[in-house]
Amino acid sequence: METRETKPVIFLFPFPLQGHLNPMFQLANIFFNRGFSITVIHTEFNSPNSSNFPHFTFVSIPDSLSEPESYPDVIEILHDLNSKCVAPFGDCLKKLISEEPTAACVIVDALWYFTHDLTEKFNFPRIVLRTVNLSAFVAFSKFHVLREKGYLSLQETKADSPVPELPYLRMKDLPWFQTEDPRSGDKLQIGVMKSLKSSSGIIFNAIEDLETDQLDEARIEFPVPLFCIGPFHRYVSASSSSLLAHDMTCLSWLDKQATNSVIYASLGSIASIDESEFLEIAWGLRNSNQPFLWVVRPGLIHGKEWIEILPKGFIENLEGRGKIVKWAPQPEVLAHRATGGFLTHCGWNSTLEGICEAIPMICRPSFGDQRVNARYINDVWKIGLHLENKVERLVIENAVRTLMTSSEGEEIRKRIMPMKETVEQCLKLGGSSFRNLENLIAYILSF
């Protein structure tokens, strides 16, 4: 029987944002179940709950981060973390490598773009986890070309014009981040691309069979091994890596609802909306007359604690037809028989979880890869509806009714079923994700 001393050890360095923690810990569980020992290096900022993962070793590094509220946007937090973690991470990794005779590699989130210099210095394999799908990955990879051609400045004046280099996408879909200083976004793209191209390989929580053309294009651009082994959450029932407590009462509420009757609404863990949009969504959900489960995390609404701006009696007048929670166990909610639609920000984790359960989507993207995902959901895969203009209550109401009760919604539901079946096949013996995981494990053991 292998012990910690004889098992190959993988070090993991997740980026401390919810949408990045989840896939990294899912990946950690996959490797643990395949015989690897796992050591998680993490920042003090948004540090994970180690008690949820007693089978892993955790090592904390200082990040000296200021209060998150003091930063103008999340990109500045990202850059500051990359700057302040260089020395602590380097010291930590050097120590771990010297102490672990069976150390195999380190897997880092792509947003830790500073790590490539250190691992080259230590001559230690570094594999990168990219938490977007292949379509968004290819779009990000063309950043330098799109910048040179002036496309980024056309996102408002020619928003609906097609992007010749990226079939299906329009100027407004380009996955850039709105920042106080445009140079900050450029710095991020350049840093991430350089880090990816100098890595020992790239892992995707994606399905090769759904994006074969994009994978071929990515392989031309990136001369390193690429491994599509998603969906991560379907391999093992992982412990929670959520930074917020799940409100489990939503599952018992779903138990009382009719099959495929509930619209589930969640706009992710980072984006925020203004008071006006929040109220429009609230009235749109209410006026649709469909049962709804709505995740409103603290901080979702600019300047507000939670849902105190809802009109007096709003929740009471729903008479149990709607439920609002601060956070929910999303995979379980989407897998519930009562859930029939998903109003989503289109982050890739959420999009993939929706596809896995064949749940049609209403897309309300905010930034980054969410725009690419929304375009694919609406125009390429045709498995949802896209809210492209200002969010108004009538638009929300009509979208919910279309998705949940119309013949158009039924056609969408029929189109998403084969995608779910493709995902299920890819995980089986001989499937693309099964095969790619075997290749990835063999690759790591070859170092």
UniProtKB/Swiss-Prot annotation:
Domain of life: Eukaryota
tRNA-binding is among the record's keywords: no
Keywords recorded for this protein, A-Z: Glycosyltransferase, Plant defense, Transferase
Reported tissue expression: Expressed in roots, leaves, hydathodes, sepals and style.
Example of a GO MF term: salicylic acid glucosyltransferase (glucoside-forming) activity
Induction remark: Induced by wounding and the bacterial pathogen Pseudomonas syringae pv. tomato (avirulent avrRpm1 strain).
Enzyme nomenclature, EC number: 2.4.1.-
SUPFAM superfamilies cross-referenced by the UniProt entry: UDP-Glycosyltransferase/glycogen phosphorylase (SSF53756)
UniProt-annotated binding residues for UDP-alpha-D-glucose: 269, 327-328, 345-353, 367-370
Annotated Gene3D superfamilies: Glycogen Phosphorylase B
CDD domains given in the database record: GT1_Gtf-like
Keyword field contains Signal: no
Enzyme class at the top of the EC tree: transferase
InterPro entries: UDP_glucos_trans, UDP_glycos_trans_CS
Gene knockout outcome: Reduced rosette size, early leaf senescence, enhanced resistance to the biotrophic pathogen Pseudomonas syringae, increased susceptibility toward necrotrophic Alternaria brassicicola and constitutively elevated salicylic acid (SA) levels.
GO biological process, one term: leaf senescence
Job description of the protein: Glycosylates the amino acid-related molecules isoleucic acid (2-hydroxy-3-methylpentanoic acid) and valic acid (2-hydroxy-3-methylbutyric acid). Acts as a negative regulator of salicylic acid (SA)-dependent plant defense in the absence of pathogens and promotes the jasmonate (JA) response. Negatively influences the onset of senescence.
Family: Belongs to the UDP-glycosyltransferase family.
Protein name: UDP-glycosyltransferase 76B1
